[in-house]
Amino acid sequence: MNIILALKRPFIWLSRVRHRCGYGVHSPFAFELITCLFYEKTPYYAYKELAQEEKKQKRNHGKGWRNESLKVKRLLFRLVNRIQPGTIIDFGTPSSSSLYLQFGKATADYTFASELSELFLEADVPVDFLYIHCHQSPVLVEDVFRICLARVVQQSVFVIRGIHYSKAMKNLWERLKADDRVGITFDLYDVGILFFDKTKIKQHYIVNF
């Protein structure tokens, strides 16, 4: 984690506290997501198994295995478990989040890539779920977003890590959520979540996650 961001964390939390628990959210879809998915505390059956598998993978991969925030990893699991995507694209540095994505729906067509040259998308196959976690390179984030944007369908969901990591990432997040093809978005600080269901009114929500 960026050290400066870590030091600022308590102040960031306080500045966003009014956005907790869905206060002021009138959209039934957004309110249900915030209260029943983002803040869900259910001890899923898979959490224990995931923790055990993480230990094994960490031993196998060593320092090349990035250990991300448990809160974010569990959110990824819950999102995939709820949406049940047919395809999952995981783009970034090899990390333990890959386990949570795959456990969310074991039968999904899961693809990992760390470079654009590895991002092979079969013709006419939609991108149902995209997780981008290479926020140290905003240009790469945008490139991956644009490539996968051409494959979105109504139920697609994109999750972008580090939207507040730098000024460049903040500016990029503003551009992405303003795209005409994007619908409802959520700023959870650690991640930004974009939906593409245009049957719902486009709105941008801040959530103190």
Question: Model segments located where?
Answer:
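A short alpha-helical cap/connector motif
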Residues: 1-131, 135-154, 164-209
